Swiss-Prot record:
GO terms for cellular component: plasma membrane. Pathway: Phospholipid metabolism; CDP-diacylglycerol biosynthesis; CDP-diacylglycerol from sn-glycerol 3-phosphate: step 1/3. This is Glycerol-3-phosphate acyltransferase. It comes from Pseudomonas putida (strain ATCC 47054 / DSM 6125 / CFBP 8728 / NCIMB 11950 / KT2440). Its main location: membrane.
Amino acid sequence: MTRSPLHRLIFGGLRRLLYLWVRSETINQSSMTLNLDRSRPVFYALPSPALTDLAVLDHECTKAGLPRPVLPVAVGPLQEPAAFFYLTPDPDWLGRQDKSGAPPTLERLVAAVSQHAEEDAQIIPVSVFWGQTPASESSPWKLLFADSWAVTGRLRRLLTVLILGRKTRVQFSAPIHLRELVQHNKGHERTVRMAQRLMRVHFRNLKTAVIGPDISHRRTLVKGLVHAPQVRQAIADEAQRENLPLAKAEAQALRYGNEIASDYTYTAIRFLEVVLSWFWNKIYDGIKVNHIEQVQGIAPGHEVIYVPCHRSHIDYLLLSYLLFRNGLTPPHVAAGINLNMPVVGNLLRRGGAFFMRRTFKGNPLYTAVFNEYLHTLYTKGFPVEYFVEGGRSRTGRMLQPRTGMLAITLRSFLRSSRTPIVFVPVYIGYERVLEGRTYLGELRGASKKKESVLDIFKVFGALKQRFGQVYVNFGEPIRLAGFLDQQQPGWREQDHGPQYRPEWLNATTARLGETVARHLNEAAAINPVNLVALALLSTSRLALDERALTRVLDLYLALLRQVPYSPHTTLPEGDGQALIEHVRSMNLVAEQKDALGRILYLDEGNAVLMTYYRNNVLHIFALPALLASFFLSSSRMSRQLLGQYVHALYPYLQAELFLRWTPEQLDEVIDQWLVALVEQGLLRQDNDLYVRPAPSSRQFVLLTLLARTITQTLQRFYMATSLLINSGQNSLSAEALEDLCVMMAQRLSILHGLNAPEFFDKTLFRHFIQTLLQQGVLHADAQGKLSYHDKLGELAEGVAKRVLSAELRLSIRQVALHRDDGLETSTL
């Protein structure tokens, strides 16, 4: 456009029009500090074609008294119509760019200087930045359009000029003298390449310094995926299977890669940091982070995989935010394809999300591309994050691990273990979860709603509510190599080819998932809402006098301080009264006053919701509650009998709640808890016997409330075993037993007023049945019918009668005995 007087006239008009809005300044270098030789011709190199950048450059040169880039210039006999060129050449008429080619102007300049020993040309690399640096920009709107490493289109550039044009900065760099390069006598082509390389490195380093590093691998990685041997083979197989041309199958693989890969940008990270800082301060009273220093120590030299528990959609944003604020690289986060929505999906992708389909079944090409993508992330050292639970927990419990991502990780590590992999469990605890009411509806039977871009606007409703504090605890890291050394000592000597899938993979992956879940539970952050929910839900009327509730909470705190669950578990500050005041301020408990004081209770709206927060810490209290349960029906028990009954029930509690102790450690922990219960006055020791308090005493009430913490879990166990025994050997399949258990639990919840939908959660029954099979108590025949060992009767009656009241056992047995065909086929 600037090659003729007419073009220069039009360009001048456009520049003046642009500067009706744009304001620019030169940073770092001035015309005085460039050390230009005014007797030698000056050229300007811009990184890529942009008319607005050229106009800003021309304006700043005019202002600084530098030669204008749009005017003709001579180098010996060479006459150039303009004194600028783009390092990336102008696109052709189809919009294509030959990035490997050299700018024609640079080719001619090198030739002219080479042929005329007295000539030289000074090339000044010039960078134009629109807006402030992302690190200093505080406006989220402006950060959306700030300079980035991504290639921008004309519409985005127009919006960038309109939004950021008032703070445009130009940086002139020290000139490159072509004479110095030519004197190396490398020949024409190598000299041109040398000049290009110098400018490319310069532009990249400068851009990194100004807008942050290029942390996106998308532009280079996706194309590289299809050249990996495993993906090439999958492409060939796809072409043969679907009778497609090879190029078409390869194009499909590229589409999969683009669908999956994240597009990390520093500006998006800064945008999210600014927006989320405002958001957290609006809805939360603070974010408490514990044990992050161990991650800061382990991150260098390791491939870090963050494995947080999954309670809310904002888990991923919260963790990335905290890592960034604490000087750690935000991870690439696995997100469900359902979140790849318009606007939101693009922002999440630029913030580090990579998207995965819910199932890979029946699509080997997609599987190959996804596996290779993850393998590339791991081998290049990018931190990664995924949720081993798969989806968000609607009940507040730790869900059974989904092992798909763990299996991919394990196979990638076997394929290349040069970079040690470490899993970092992250427990995220909310005093009030954003989706609480949604979970409540889903637990009551409402269908799960599909995510929509309109859901964003629902967030604004949350700004009027109080959500308390958020607790983020980093758990004990799991070194994958060390884990494999324990599980499969000879794994290092085995031949681990790209397609290697050892026989022990599935079992080892399952154990890895259980280990991650246990480490997550070990890092639990116990908060005031958890403890108040635990106390009130243990009462028959969901209510307690304020003084009584204070005593219960003080007891819980004393027990937890005396027998810490793990070094990574954290407790709330303050005493029982302080905890009550905190929960009251969040409107999670109702109150009624009378002449004797205040009664705190859970109303119908909050009763079910509070089961969510109780379940967050159920595993912490499982063992002391189980010990307390034995004294509801027995006034005294020997240490030997207590140990026997705890060992009988422990495998099932451990499988459901991911308790941390091995069977070998159990006796020591039982003794610690018995000492604590004695010191708190809930039990009395008489030689080898433990004796409960008098039923009329305050201590017995406290013991009863502690025991009721685990009652519903034990009821479910008893339901399943009673149904099995009353059905007889080889009469029920596992699926039929699950259905019967759910219907029975629904009926009992009505009869006994159990206001907890997870009481009849099918997955809990399913996992209990699986554990019975694993323990050898059940056996499935060829037709899938279940038979049981004599141990089941001992478990059902011998142990159950010690921990469940006679009334409850009778009610469960009656429903089990009197079930008929209608019960099996109808809903209750």
